[in-house]
Amino acid sequence: MDQHCHNALKVANYLSQHPKVEKTIYPSLADHPQHALASKQMSQGGSIVTFVIKGNNAFKFMNKLNIFDISNNFGDTKSLVTHPATTTHRVIGEEGRKKLNIPDAMIRLSIGLEDVDDLIEDIDASFKQIL
């Protein structure tokens, strides 16, 4: 888990600075609304990084990734990506997702054990291809 968390923090920091990302959600980022609580309860931020991509590009972005596999569930040593609005939160419906602040542009990453620089390079290449 240490390597998952280390990689996830680096990916979250990268995404939080990217101009094509509207919002990055990761409990170890200082701007996370529950950062202080997470710091007290957790030694690390976990392996899941969520972000909202600018524009209507979630599927285009996901389809251009090479290292990440598209999946509707997480729990692997390999990096995975999912689209919450059409997988985990599909049954809630559009209005329910709006109330829960789960936009269609939201993407969730499960960060694996691959080299973190390779993961960031894959993400960056996907951004460059679609936007």
What are these regions (language model features)?
Residues 1, 5, 120-121:
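Conserved strand-to-helix beginnings and helix N-cap segments that scaffold or border functional pockets
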Residues 3, 9-72, 92-94, 98:
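Conserved small-domain helix->loop->beta segment predominantly found in fold-type I
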Residues 23, 75-86:
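Positively charged, small/polar-rich N-terminal and surface patches that mediate targeting and assembly
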Residues 45-47, 75-77, 103-105:
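A generic structural signal for well-ordered coil/turn residues at beta-strand boundaries
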Residues 65-75, 126-131:
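A common structural junction motif
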Residues 81-131:
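PLP-dependent enzyme catalytic core of the Aspartate aminotransferase-like
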